[in-house]
Amino acid sequence: NRALSLESIFSSPINFETFRSYGMQVNNFYPWLTLYPLFLLIKFTNLAIGYNLFLYIVTLITLFICHYVMYEITKKHVTSSFFAIIYTTSSFRSVEIFLRGAMGELLAMSILPLILLGFIKLYDSKKESWVMLAISMTLLIYTHVLSVAMTMVMIIIALIIQFYRKKKIEIFLIIKLIKAAIVTLLLSLAFIGPMIEQTLYQDLNRPYVDILQKRAIYLGKEFLIGSIDSELLSFGIGLTLLICLIILTFNFKKLGILSKITYIMGIISILLCTKIFP
């Protein structure tokens, strides 16, 4: 229905074609730009063919993006291929495809590796190295707003780790981040502007408010079983990543700077999903 609701998106964000024509206003608050190709595929084929074709195309794009990003970082095709396969076939993507049908989160996962590369490129000596971060963050804003918030948290954590490691504020990095933020904001105004305007104007009444803290996992037996179990509804990082985590833990001192920072951020990400974090 999210895709079908884009039938009249260029004339009005409110759609009367779905959900018994009650007038769905979700497009004011939920990005739709990267979802529009799904609507076109459904329009020119049918719902089943268009939906499955879209999933196939997104999966291929995710594979190519992951390989490109990791190759830019490591310059190793084997490492890049392993990363692309593990990331694209991860349990979370499988849940989004086969259980939840959450297209926004699925598309966001295709963009996140580009943001990683964009952040790493900030340390490049080239003056315009911030452009990739600005473009990829803009794409994410037009795809999934919650992912933007989580990405910003991870960027802040990475900056804190870097500050702790170097004991100084890197002015050149701050300048590039400011440039990327300004350009991202300007490019995203087409969505952010109407969303803020409607948020301030409309009283949003939610029939049910979920308490996410209740869904947090216990860092112990539940986490280990969820990681080893192949059940998509279980909570964990998966057997492959669990093995990688154990290996990296015992070989932490041998890792390079980038690998150490990535490892630390991975541990922090896991802790944020547990009962430890309020």
List the predicted regions and their residue ranges.
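Membrane-embedded transmembrane-helix bundle of lipid-linked glycan/lipid transferases
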Residues: 1-278
